[in-house]
Amino acid sequence: MQAMAELDDFFAKKDKKKSKNKTKFVTADEMVKNLEDGTKREVVKPKKPEAAAGGVAVVGENENSGTKVPESAPPVEEEWKEFEEEQRKDYSGLKIGQLSTITAQESAESRATRVPTAQDGGNYDEDDEDSNGYDNADVNKERVGHGPWKKVVPAEEVMQIPVPVEVEKPSSKTYVSPALRYSQQAGSGLGGGTVGGALRPRRAAPDITNTEFFPTLSAARPEEQRKKKNEPAFEEVRHGSRFQRVQESTAAPVAASNRFQSLDDEAS
């Protein structure tokens, strides 16, 4: 029996392989059947109503008895929101003055400096302070003095006398002769000038004929150019292209006469 079962499995596997290797041809009738089977399998599922704020939706057999979502439910917020710039409100028309707050340090200082008066019966009672640790009398005084109805009186400004600032005169770039400069100093009373190294009296007219204060161009002498010791001297040459220099012969003169008579004797 076991051998028969193994044979059946073997042949069944072979049949499956053969069916896979065969070419698959689908006829028109088979296509229609497949389409009909697909439409039957598809089951229309009703959409589940979404539960909204203010109402609960029931799905299943009790849909008719379930509560409906009210129409006045707020719409679902979108994912993106438009950015709106916040407009600053203008409070300038309210005419609000300076508002000051009382700190614990200020109230402690006021309690320390408080002196019992006749209204207090000469006694200082700490029960006058409220639960926050502030003195009611001091708080009332400060509120009266610092409320919005209290106009802030500006302090009197001390008139400051402006100090004159000495402005330095810009120095002119024009040339001023020494005589004119001394005359200006003498006219302003700063002191007298000097004439030839000697002090001249104040407010004295300068000497126009003095060449030291009023130099002239005719008095100027051109300085002669000094020649250097090792500087070579140059000769002035005119018509150098026409001038031809003849070299003199330096050879010794030849004596033509016979200074010895020995030659004559030998000849005879």
From Swiss-Prot:
Segments of this protein annotated with the region Disordered = 40-145, 184-268
Composition bias (Basic and acidic residues) maps to 40-50, 221-239
Q: Name one GO cellular component term.
A: cytoplasm
Ranges that cross the membrane: none
* Compositional bias of kind Acidic residues: 76-85, 123-132
User: Which Pfam families does this chain map to?
Assistant: CDV3
- Polar residues composition-biased segments: 98-107
What domain of life does the native source organism fall in? Eukaryota
Question: Which residue intervals are annotated with compositional bias (Low complexity) in the record?
Answer: 51-61
Q: Which PANTHER family match?
A: PROTEIN CDV3 HOMOLOG
Query: According to its UniProt record, which protein family does this protein belong to?
Result: Belongs to the CDV3 family.
- Could you identify this protein by its name? Protein CDV3 homolog
